[in-house]
Curated annotation (Swiss-Prot):
The gene is nuoN. Belongs to the complex I subunit 2 family. NCBIfam families: NDH_I_N. Its EC number is 7.1.1.-. It comes from Geobacter metallireducens (strain ATCC 53774 / DSM 7210 / GS-15). This is NADH-quinone oxidoreductase subunit N.
Amino acid sequence: MTITELWALIPLLILACGSVFVLMLGAIVPGRCGTVIGVAVCAGTALWAMLAPPQPLAPPTLGVTVTPFTRFFLVFFAVTAGLSLLLARDHAARQGLKGEEYPATILFGTFGMGVVASAANFLTLFLGLEALTFAFYILVAYDHNRPASGEAGLKYLLMGAVSAAFVAFGIALLYGATGTLEISRAVAASAAGGGIALAGWGLLLAGLAFKISLAPAHLWTPDIYQGGPTPVVAFLASGSKGAAIALFLLILSPLGTLGTLRAPLWGLAFLSMTVGNLAALLQPNVKRMLAYSSVAQMGYVALALLSGGRGYEAAAFYAVAYGAMVLAAFGALASLEGETPLEQVDDLRGLGYHRPFQGVVLAVAMLALAGIPPTVGFVGKFAIFFAALKGGEAPLAVIGILTAAASAYYYLRVVVNLYMKPADETGSGQRPTVAEALSLGIAALAIFILGIWPGPLFDLAAAILR
């Protein structure tokens, strides 16, 4: 490996070495310094990916290539991980959770996300995907004080194993049909691969549908969101979904035309938008509501992927937008939680007055998820529906617009409970710590800044997909 190649791989090495360092330091010097080091590692990764001179790897080294696409998502993953670490620090202390395994595992999961975004062949892609999934197996089950957390971790493990089997079998069929593990060559040779290649792409799509929670492969999502520690769910909903979107873009954008994959992706988008929103309408549990909401939101991303061209740009934009929105939503919930988690939407009654900062952030997140201007949620949804109309997906775009309008009911129900219903006298929520306030403030500002001034991010999304 040359110095140039090593230089390009430094962001991934920072994350991998940082994870090991935090874990070993926690064993030698127990304390809470892991979060500080973890945030510093994430900041270093993001700064290096943004500011270091471009050193593309061609041909790929170790199955990894570093391109503007890779750098874009590395910055996104590092920022979401850093904000999640800030949220987790004091939340873990309130829940009685100790040890540096928490920040170390978050860093390891971020490393897996970076490997996924920089993968040049299917083997590296699979290893990165399983690295980030393995990290979430641990994180979801980390709260040993709550049986629901262990149950959620077990369910995620089982569903993750099924997903991994689909992905691995799909990769095996593609290798058999095309004779190569390199993604670009496999895409080019797929036309000559016949039915075997088609089956491989179909299995790969099915496995990724599990990862991104597209209906009907979404049934694990509500239990994981409800049972897992809230800061972990924030990271899962932002970073992990962003990695899955990056993976879809990595595979689908070189295809040019989706061909026979269009029909199953159309069905996944339709089911996700309708089933996700209908299920969320009926949910009294706030985390399960947001879980079903995430199914619908990923349905909009699938609609963007169907549209091609501008749709891919809209999907990349929405990965960042959705990350900011769910970090703000789950971050506010995590900040409000004491020794027991907030469960029902009714538990939020009057908290907008008792805890104004968290109330405002949560309300902003709900308005953004509902697609109300001038938030980034409105801009992202507008871009997706516009791309769908331009891309010949008018019927599905109309369905998306109608379901997005219906979703305003359950998002605004949270805002109504925050500000228009009397407070529950049994508790008034936790005050935000400095770390939590910083994380929530950054997420809320991103929602407004990207909603008012989305041009630079759209330009960047277009540039990385050229």
